[in-house]
Design a protein with these regions (language model features):
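Short mixed-charge
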Residues: 18-25, 89-109, 199-219
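Donor nucleotide-sugar binding/catalytic pocket of nucleotide-sugar-dependent glycosyltransferases
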Residues: 73-131
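Short hydrophobic beta-strand element within catalytic cores of glycosyltransferases
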Residues: 266-269, 283-284
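Conserved catalytic-core segment of nucleotide-activated headgroup transferases in glycan assembly
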Residues: 119-234
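Extended catalytic core of nucleotide-activated donor transferases of GT-like folds
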Residues: 2-86
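Short glycine/serine-rich donor-binding loops of glycosyltransferases
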Residues: 254-257, 272
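Acidic donor-binding loop of glycosyltransferase active sites
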Residues: 234-252, 262-265
Length: 298
C-alpha cells in the first residue's frame, strides 16, 4: 500500500485524515478501526475492527490468529486472504504435560471488503500524460509487456512476486527472435524506496539475469520512481503496452492487475491468490480449426 495513498487536496481523504488518532485517546471510542498487520491489533474501543491484507500464502502465524481474536470484526482484501485465516488451526499444548488442551483458530468474524478500483482515476483513454509519452518514445519495440509491482526479498525464484524468474522466462521465450520483431518487457518496479541506491540495485539484478543471453537477450526496460495516478493510467494505456504479465506467487489483492484490466488489454497472471477474485480464467485465441491429419490412421 503506498504511503502517499491519502491526498491532502482530496476532500474525502481529508475527512479520513481528520479521524486518524494521533494522540492518547481521552475517552473510549464507540468504534475503533485499526489498519495493520494482525499481531499489532489492539482492543481500544467498545467495538473494534481490524483491517488487514493478511498474508499471501495458505497459513498464518499463531500471532496473527491471536491478534485477530482480540478484535470484534476483521476485514480482509480477498477470499484468498480470508481462507488462510479460516483454514489455519494450531494445537494448544500444556507446557508441563505436553498434552493438547485445545485449538488455536480464528474465532472473530471475518469478511472480505473488496477494494475495487476508482474508475475516475483508472480508465481507458488515448489522452496520455506527456511524461509517459516522452519516457516511452525511445522504446522502438512495437509490442511490450508490462510488469508493475515491488521486487521483494529473495534470490531468483524465491521473491514473492517472482520477478527474477519472470525476467528469465521472458529471455528464454524471446531470445531467438529477430531484433526487428523482438518483444520487450517493461518493469515498473522497486524494492522499498525510490532512491538511487534502490534503482542501481535493481539494475544490477536485471543485468545479472540477462547476462548469460548476451546479444540474444530481448529488450528489457526499467522504470523507477514515484508516478502519479494519472501517469500510471497513461502507462497502462500507452499503445506500446500490449499486455500485463505477472508471475506472482501470492497477492493479498493485486491492485495493479485490476487497474490495468480497465484498459481492456490482456492480463497474464498466475491462477492463484487474491487477484482471482476479479481476474477470471478466460483464454480466447482467434483462429480456425482445420483437419490436419494425414490420410493414414494414427
Amino acid at each position: 500500500t503506498p504511503g502517499n495513498a491519502l491526498k491532502g487536496d482530496n476532500p474525502e481523504h481529508v475527512e479520513i485524515i481528520k479521524r486518524i488518532a494521533r494522540q492518547n485517546i481521552t475517552r473510549q471510542p464507540d468504534v475503533f478501526i485499526q489498519i495493520s498487520v494482525p499481531n499489532e491489533f489492539q482492543k481500544v474501543g467498545k467495538y473494534n475492527i481490524g483491517i488487514t491484507a493478511g498474508i499471501e500464502t495458505t497459513n498464518v502465524s499463531h500471532e496473527f490468529l491471536q491478534g485477530c481474536n482480540n478484535m470484534d470484526l476483521i476485514l480482509v482484501t480477498s477470499e484468498h486472504s480470508k481462507k488462510g485465516f479460516v483454514d489455519t488451526v494450531y494445537d494448544k499444548v500444556d507446557e508441563k504435560t505436553k498434552q493438547k488442551t485445545g485449538d488455536l483458530k480464528l474465532t472473530t468474524p471475518m469478511e472480505v471488503l473488496f477494494e475495487g478500483v476508482d474508475t475516475n482515476v483508472y480508465y481507458k483513454t488515448n489522452d496520455l500524460h506527456d511524461t509517459i509519452k516522452d519516457e516511452l518514445s525511445s522504446i522502438k519495440n512495437p509490442f511490450c509487456y508490462l510488469f508493475v509491482g515491488h521486487w521483494l526479498k529473495g534470490n531468483i525464484g524465491q521473491d514473492r512476486k517472482d520477478v527474477g524468474m519472470m525476467i528469465k522466462t521472458f529471455c528464454e521465450t524471446f531470445k531467438n527472435k529477430a531484433a526487428r520483431n523482438r518483444t520487450a518487457l517493461i518493469l515498473k518496479t522497486s524494492h522499498a524506496t525510490f532512491s538511487i541506491i534502490d534503482r542501481d540495485h535493481i539494475t544490477k539484478k536485471v543485468q545479472e539475469i540477462i547476462a548469460p543471453y548476451g546479444n540474444k537477450a530481448p529488450e528489457i526496460y526499467f522504470l523507477h520512481g514515484d508516478l502519479s495516478d494519472e501517469e500510471m493510467n497513461s502507462l497502462y494505456n500507452h499503445p506500446k503496452i500490449k499486455a500485463m504479465v505477472s508471475f506472482t506467487k501470492g497477492e493479498g489483492y493485486g491492485r495493479p492487475l485490476l487497474e490495468f484490466s480497465v484498459t481492456g488489454k490482456p492480463v497474464i497472471a498466475s491462477n492463484w491468490s487474491g487477484h482471482i477474485d476479479f481476474l477470471k480464467h478466460a483464454v480466447l485465441l482467434p483462429g480456425q480449426l482445420t483437419d490436419n491429419r494425414l490420410p493414414i490412421n494414427f
